[in-house]
């Protein structure tokens, strides 16, 4: 069920030449990776869903892009050490409530007022992050290490005595 058909979020970053990502992208051509701009947009979308109250009844859940949808990402500019400001904008098109709340939005990043990144109708959803089924070896290891259980609140711990 669609509960909202529009919304807006804006985030700004003052760019400094000493930011961590400049040294790690292109040799002798420092810039922010376009994938990092996209990740910042996804984080802003996640914040929007969380601020809308969708995480309150879903403790332990996480955000992920909707994998079944194709996305067209356009990088047309760069954030460089001489840039002054990166602005990330999320133009919410639709918020769908249901078993997995989903947000659909257009994304735009501008650098010093010039369009640098655009993505049309990107979707992010809130999904359970438990039980841990993706890495059964971690579950087995945790079950075998009863010291952690006893120390941090499991059966036989100081907290339950």
Question: Where are the language model's segments positioned?
Answer:
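Active-site loops and adjacent core secondary-structure elements that bind or stabilize anionic groups
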Residues: 1-2, 113
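Catalytic strand-loop segment that frames the active site of acyl-thioester-processing enzymes
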Residues: 4-32, 159-161
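Soluble ligand-binding/transfer domains with enclosed cavities or grooves
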Residues: 6-11, 29, 39, 44, ...
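Active-site helix/loop of acyl-thioester processing domains in fatty-acid/polyketide metabolism
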Residues: 31-60
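Short, basic/aromatic beta-hairpin or loop at an interaction surface
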Residues: 60-67
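Hydrophobic beta-sheet segments that form the core/acyl-binding groove
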Residues: 67-115
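Segments adjacent to and within acyl-thioester-processing domains across lipid
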Residues: 114-161
